Every structure is written in structure tokens, then in C-alpha cells.
Regions:
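Multi-pass alpha-helical membrane architecture of UbiA-family
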Residues: 1-314
Length: 314
């Protein structure tokens, strides 16, 4: 593996693409009532949004880098053939990558805030700095603590759905005349509700996948004394939690489709619910092998991607 390929693998380029897709679809699909309202300046400039997207991508990429830096010993046990830190990049090089990506992410985020929010740019800056600190804390300590690490990762992914909406609301709050012109559009449309629903969906699906990944990494986590859900509660209880969580997601999908009457996405959401139900049922008979959990992790990632793509039809 050459160093360029290794770097893209280190920053989890597929996950970064998914985050970028989430942000773009929230901005263009879920915010479509503001695009169509005909009010000049109803949304922040495309440049400011693009810079915000790049900023978040860099900060999340930095989070993946520092995670692998702290996980060297665990990865030597769980996936020695995929080891990057200490094998392809030295620990010093890895720390340099982390610092550069973090600094670039914060600076680009600040520029985005200045362009769109003027004097309120510090709010975006503070949010991005908090996210950076949260991802670092996760890798250095919280990852090894019961449930906390799973929640931090789930929050970080869900934040990619929530951030474009927050960015637009901050922009409008700083432009009172524009806000007064689009207030009725915001109130009458389901825009804000849909953003919250997709944020919750991203959080729950990521939480499920993180629990499954903990089961996949059971061997290495035990050796490094991590207190993950499968270690503390055991595989059987973990499977029960997964099944109940999947059923909860299915009920929420069907409920929100019914309440909002989003007919364009109805078929998509029902199909997703049925697939998730099959997944829940199969967990009852799941063999205790890492490869099986890896397959479930991939399935959950595909389901999340389908959920993101469904924004196009809302």
C-alpha cells in the first residue's frame, strides 16, 4: 500500500463522502422551500456553505487520524493486516496530519462564518472547536468507557445533518429583513421537522453500527481493558439491545412517514423498515463470529446511505 492510498484509508474517505453527501442533501433537498421561495438571499452563499462543508470534513478526518493514533495497540490485535499508524506512517507523522487537518478545519470554518454570519462567526467557530475537542476526548479516553464513546460518535455523525440547518438559521437570525420575508415559508413547510427526523435517524443508525463494531472488535478491546457494551453486558444482552433499537427505528420511520404524509418517500421508508426488521430477526440466530458482525456493520452502513439518499425524494 502506497502512502497516498494509506492516507485516504486513514481518514476513512468513504465516511467523509457520506458526510459530504448528507450536508449537501440537507442544504439542497430538505431546505428546498427556501430555495423555491423566490426571496433574494434566503440562504447563505454557496461559497460559505462549501467552506463549512470542507471545514467539517477536515475536522472529522482529523478525528479519524487521532483515533487510529490512540488505537495502535488495539488494531495490532483486531486488524494487524490493515494497520497504518506505526506500519506505514510513524506516530509523529500521524500527529502532524492531525494538527494540520484540525488547524485547516478551524480556519476554513471561521472564514465560512465570517462570510455568512458577519459578527456572529464566533458561534460556528465555537461549535467546530467543541466538536474537535469532543472527537479528541473520544479517542484518548471516552472510547474505552461504557456507552459514552458510542454516543459521542453517533452525535458527531448526526451533527453533519443538523449543522447545515443550524448554519441557515444563524444566517437568517443575522438578517432580520430576509427572515421576516421567509418566516411563513419556514413555519408552513416541514423543513425543520424533517431535519430533526433525519438527525435522529443518523444518530440511531450510527449508534447501532458502533455497537456492532464493538462486537467485531471484541478481542482487542478486551486486551486493552475497554468497557464496551458487548464486554460489559455480554453478546446475548447486546443482541437484545440491537433488536429493540432496530424495532424502535422501524416504528419511528413508519410513524413520521404517516404524520408528515411524505408520499414520495413512503415506499423507500417502508422498504427500509422491512429490511431492518429482517435484520432484527436474524440477530436472534447470529453466530458469534467476527465476520458475521462485520457483515451486519456493512448492512447498517448501506441502510444509512439509503436513508440519506431518500432526502432527494422528500
Amino acid at each position: 500500500m502506497n502512502k497516498i492510498t494509506a492516507f485516504f484509508k486513514l481518514v476513512r474517505w468513504q465516511n467523509l463522502l457520506m458526510i459530504a453527501l448528507m450536508m449537501i442533501l440537507v442544504y439542497h433537498s430538505l431546505m428546498s422551500p427556501l430555495h423555491a421561495c423566490g426571496v433574494m438571499g434566503a440562504l447563505p452563499s454557496a461559497l460559505s456553505f462549501l467552506l463549512l462543508l470542507i471545514s467539517l470534513i477536515f475536522i472529522v478526518a482529523a478525528g479519524y487520524v487521532i483515533n487510529d493514533y490512540f488505537d495502535v495497540e488495539i488494531d495490532k490485535v483486531n486488524k494487524p493486516e490493515q494497520l497504518i499508524v506505526s506500519k506505514i506512517f510513524s506516530e509523529t507523522e500521524t500527529k502532524v496530519f492531525y494538527v494540520l487537518l484540525t488547524i485547516l478545519g478551524i480556519i476554513i470554518g471561521a472564514i465560512s462564518g465570517v462570510i455568512a454570519l458577519n459578527s456572529k462567526f464566533y458561534i460556528i467557530l465555537a461549535i467546530l472547536a467543541l466538536l474537535t475537542a469532543l472527537l479528541y476526548s473520544y479517542s484518548s479516553s471516552y472510547k474505552r468507557k461504557f456507552v459514552v464513546g458510542n454516543i459521542i460518535v453517533s452525535f458527531s455523525v448526526a451533527f453533519a445533518v443538523f449543522l447545515p440547518w443550524l448554519f441557515v438559521m444563524l444566517y437568517l437570525s443575522d438578517n432580520v429583513l430576509i427572515l421576516s420575508s421567509v418566516r411563513d415559508v419556514i413555519i408552513s413547510s416541514s423543513m425543520s421537522k424533517l431535519v430533526m427526523i433525519y438527525t435522529a435517524f443518523a444518530f440511531l443508525m450510527t449508534l447501532l453500527r458502533e455497537i456492532v463494531k464493538d462486537a467485531e472488535d471484541l478481542k482487542g478491546d478486551k486486551l486493552t481493558r475497554c468497557r464496551t457494551i458487548p464486554i460489559v453486558l455480554g453478546i446475548k444482552k447486546m443482541n437484545v439491545i440491537l433488536i429493540l433499537s432496530i424495532l424502535l427505528i422501524c416504528m419511528l420511520l413508519i410513524y413520521f412517514t404517516y404524520v408528515l404524509y411524505v408520499m414520495h418517500s413512503y415506499i423507500t421508508l417502508i422498504i427500509m423498515s422491512l429490511i431492518l426488521l429482517c435484520l432484527a430477526l436474524s440477530l436472534t440466530y447470529l453466530p458469534r463470529k467476527d465476520i458475521s458482525y462485520h457483515k451486519y456493520s456493512v448492512f447498517l452502513k448501506i441502510m444509512m446511505l439509503l436513508g440519506i439518499i431518500s432526502m432527494i425524494f422528500v
